[in-house]
Amino acid sequence: MNARNGRNQHKKETEDKHMAAILSINAAGQSGKKINKNIYGHFSEHLGRCIYGGVYVGENSDTPNVNGMRTDVVQALKKIGVPVLRWPGGCFADEYHWEDGIGPKETRKRMVNTNWGGVVEDNSFGTHEFMELCRQIGCEPYVNANVGSGTVREMAEWVEYMNSTGDSTVVQKRWANGHKEPFNLKYLGVGNEEAITPEFRERFGLIFAA
């Protein structure tokens, strides 16, 4: 290769690099497969200050809030466009009993969070509070039910509580707690991966069969 050809080759490579650097692609209006927005979903668990002091401070807090939900956190979650939010865990889901988190807050059962630090929780953030959080964010709720220490019946009644339009005893509890209409939950998880024991597999089989 002579010097002239070498200079031309170098010039062409430089131009190619420059062109590649400014290449832009606009797919607007093009047809094709769409990415399911729910892959960008988020996860909330009773761990550290994720729930208490995080998304939830209570109605009587000096921290700005709407119905107990921290205004700044809700605004941040709305800004990033959370499509779906999972709760109550995680590991915590498999020790959470939903009936402890409904009804008047002053009478709710206190519990020890054995998964995360052994802290005592007052269950002031329960099903209704989670649904309120999702309403404020504008996302779909995703509830992960207790299979590790719960029963199939407990899970079934939680779904009934959230979604049934009938007038069963379970649904009447929802009415008494201020929510006449069902929550219309679309996404339900079945336990967490750390609890895959023979008992878990048995319960999962019963749930799947139902």
Spans of model-derived segments:
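Low-complexity, intrinsically disordered or signal/transmembrane-proximal segments
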Residues: 9-10
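Non-catalytic accessory regions flanking glycosidase/transglycosidase catalytic cores in CAZymes
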Residues: 13-210
